[in-house]
A protein has these predicted regions:
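Membrane-interface micro-motifs in multi-pass membrane enzymes
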Residues: 128-151, 166
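Central hydrophobic cores of alpha-helical transmembrane segments
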Residues: 105-107, 160-165, 169-174, 195
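Hydrophobic alpha-helical segments of integral membrane proteins
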Residues: 61-69, 91, 157-161, 214-222
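Hydrophobic, membrane-inserted alpha-helices
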Residues: 82-86, 154-156, 171-180
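Structural signal for the C-terminal ends of transmembrane alpha-helices
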Residues: 2, 33-34, 147-153, 201-207
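Alpha-helical transmembrane bundle and helix-membrane interface signal
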Residues: 93, 149-162, 208-212
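C-terminal transmembrane module of polytopic alpha-helical membrane proteins
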Residues: 1-15, 25, 176-271
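N-terminal TM1-TM2 helical hairpin plus the immediately adjacent luminal interfacial "cap"
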Residues: 11-132, 181-194, 203-204
Length: 271
């Protein structure tokens, strides 16, 4: 896809992006309310939904997705939602909601598995019991997609009066995450880089309309191929039977009946 140039403004608030943001904000305020009126319940939900590598390895497999809906700080949540609005709506307007949903959740899962891997191989640092929250993994996948597909697009860096191309912004974020690998928050940095890598692999390897569309097309292709095979098989059996009756019948290569006087390449008369 060609790179585009221009100054990026905030896109529309709609579609899958709007639904995703509303879910995140709704869950955040629900947990905030429960923390006041039913703190034990809020704590139980956090243990159930936040990604804890040790819990994941003991069967809490859903946490590799649910952690992206759990947020614990108002400032971090606001920044993530603004970034998700900016990147998600823009990409959704160009590629559709299905493609965006696949990219986002694939990146979320990739980031979660990266965090689990670090927790597994760095048990001595206590990361196996570290609770991971936030949709940063999906955002990093969107960020990489934005930088790769629209690298020359420029936008204002609020609140600074300057513009930056998307590809340079992606490089800056990747360098920050690499630097954070040497800090106490390295599990978040490792997860961010995992989400970015999986997002990059998705936009390079996934079909143009996404995996769901490709799987649907593949299923119907296999089903139709099976029906054609059955029709050809039945046609051959019928030809053998009619020859035993000293009669000739004609079928095309797809098993459709044709008359002896018809042109087999003329499909208008086929039954």
């Amino acid at each position: 896809m060609p790179r585009t140039a221009g100054i990026m403004n905030f896109p529309d608030f709609r579609g899958f992006t709007r639904g995703l943001i509303l879910w995140n904000v709704g869950v955040y305020f629900l947990l905030l309310l429960l923390g006041v009126v039913a703190a034990p319940l809020a704590h139980s939900i956090l243990n159930f939904a936040a990604l804890v590598p040790a819990f994941f390895l003991h069967g809490y497999l859903w946490q590799v997705i649910t952690y992206c809906f759990i947020h614990t700080g108002i400032l971090g949540t606001a920044l993530e939602m603004l970034t998700l609005w900016f990147l998600g709506s823009f990409l959704e307007s160009h590629h559709g909601p299905r493609w965006l949903a696949e990219l986002f959740f694939t990146s979320v899962i990739g980031a979660g598995l990266a965090a689990v891997a670090l927790g597994l191989f760095a048990r001595g640092d206590g990361y196996a019991l570290f609770a991971i929250t936030g949709c940063f993994g999906g955002i990093f996948g969107l960020l990489v997609a934005f930088g790769v597909l629209y690298g020359d697009l420029e936008f204002m860096l609020f609140p600074f009066p300057m513009t930056m191309k998307a590809k340079y912004l992606v490089i800056v974020y990747m360098l920050i995450s690499l630097a954070m690998l040497f800090s106490s928050n390295r599990i978040y940095a490792f997860a961010e880089l995992g989400g970015a890598l999986v997002g990059y692999l998705y936009i390079k390897a996934a079909p143009r309309r996404g995996y769901a569309f490709a799987m649907s097309e593949g299923y119907f292709g296999l089903r139709n191929g099976y029906y054609r095979w059955k029709r050809r098989r039945a046609a051959k059996k019928f030809e053998v039977y009619m020859r035993k009756q000293n009669r000739d019948v004609y079928f095309d290569k797809e098993g459709r009946y044709t008359g002896s006087e018809k042109d087999p390449n003329d499909r208008k008369w086929m039954n």
